[in-house]
Amino acid sequence: MPRPTLTSGYWHTDELLNLGFKAVGKDVSVSRDCCIVGQQNISLGDHVRIDAMTLLSAGSGYIDIGSYVHIASFCSLGGAGGITLEDFSGLSQGVRVYSASDDYSGKSLTNPCVPSRYKAVAVAPVRLERHVIVGSNSVILPGVTIGEGASVGALSLVSRSLEPWYVYFGTPARRLKPRCRDLLALEAALRQEEGKPAPSRPD
């Protein structure tokens, strides 16, 4: 006799389209235990997996997720100012990505129960470029761009934009060393295997 499963499973591409997502690619899995707000402003590329207890809140902003992206369990993405995760990027467990934040200086009132005219909310888009990986329980604040190929160690606070192809760690996140680029050859091999063109790159 098979043992009963203790998980509620995943939504897949056809189901997600029926739920009203802006766009959904192929081979997409989103845990049924996720909390999703504003799915009409959320786009999912190909080969995406989002695990249990993750919050995706696009609201009136947007969350655009590329292809070959994994978002582990217990992550939180607040997309009021816009969030973009490019191809081959990933978030480990418990990462928080904020594209809007209250003013903590005491110059204004805070929290969503207060009328907006009494608040000074910072709203700015967040972008994780290709091959960015963010370690567990890290926090990314509004207006940050993490450059292509950068990696961020666990428990880091990213309050400013990070340059491509370095390893970062700390509170605030500091540059430690260059990151190896061997993964680009592996990406090219995967794309060739699947008959997909190489991505265009800026001059």
Which residues fall in each region the model found?
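Terminal amphipathic alpha-helical/low-complexity segments used for targeting or macromolecular assembly
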Residues: 1-27, 88, 94-95, 99-119, ...
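Flexible, glycine/small-residue-enriched loop-and-beta-strand segment within the central core
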Residues: 10, 32-44, 49-140, 171, ...
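Helix-turn-helix DNA-binding module
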Residues: 160
